[in-house]
């Protein structure tokens, strides 16, 4: 299942749930979600970028997660600041966004050595983020994440090492 699933009944309660399966090991999927060198490649919907120098991650309870997404078309910036409530590598990330109070819990479930289900549950979602357009944007960021994971997984595979003589571990 590589589709994003959302529960309409949760939307009415100010909650969103997204589930997506990625063709990559759980440890890699988790690492990409806490490493600014990876986040810069996929954080935000299509049409935005997240400059590496504007991403801060201190993945520990009480640590800060900060990003700035830049709209590629007009240069508008969208900042996010959150504080980690819980971090259990490679199983779970939970944070609360400072500006909205939205709580996000992301679970990483191994479905085998090279498949991971990511379950994202957002609570206290601001009404502005409950629109179909915003949800489509979030889904497109998961598409970008899948593409990034595919590139990284390919670069770290034994086949890649055999062809290039090196194995890139990130």
Residue ranges of model-derived segments:
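Beta-strand/loop substructures that line and gate deep hydrophobic ligand-binding cavities in soluble
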Residues: 92-140
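A short, structured loop/turn motif at beta-sheet edges
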Residues: 26-27, 59-60, 85-90, 107-117
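Hydrophobic pocket/interface hotspot
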Residues: 29, 39, 65-67, 84, ...
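Intrinsic-disorder/low-complexity, polar/charged segments enriched in Ser/Thr/Lys/Arg/Asp/Glu/Gln
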Residues: 13-19, 26, 52, 64, ...
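Short beta-edge strand/loop motif at the mouth of beta-sheet-based domains
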Residues: 17-18, 37-77, 158-162, 166-170
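Hydrophobic ligand-binding cavity/cleft-lining segments
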Residues: 1-49, 170
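A conserved amphipathic terminal alpha-helix motif
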Residues: 123-170
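Hydrophobic/aromatic beta-strand elements that line small-molecule binding cavities or substrate pockets
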Residues: 20, 54-57, 80-86, 103-110
């Amino acid at each position: 299942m590589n589709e994003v699933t959302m529960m309409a009944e949760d939307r009415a309660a100010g909650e969103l749930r997204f589930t997506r399966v990625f063709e990559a090991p759980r440890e890699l999927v988790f690492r990409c979600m806490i490493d600014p060198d990876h986040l810069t490649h996929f954080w935000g919907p299509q049409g935005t970028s997240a400059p590496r120098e504007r991403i801060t991650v201190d993945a520990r309870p009480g640590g800060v997660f900060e990003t700035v997404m830049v709209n590629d078309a007009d240069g508008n910036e969208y900042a996010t600041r959150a504080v980690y409530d819980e971090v259990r590598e490679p199983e779970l990330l939970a944070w609360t966004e400072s500006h909205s109070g939205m709580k996000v819990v992301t679970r990483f479930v191994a479905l085998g050595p090279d498949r991971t289900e990511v379950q994202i549950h957002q609570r206290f979602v601001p009404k502005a983020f409950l629109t179909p357009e915003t949800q489509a944007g979030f889904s497109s960021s998961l598409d970008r994440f899948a593409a990034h994971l595919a590139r990284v997984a390919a670069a770290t595979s034994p086949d890649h090492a055999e062809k290039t003589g090196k194995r890139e571990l990130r």
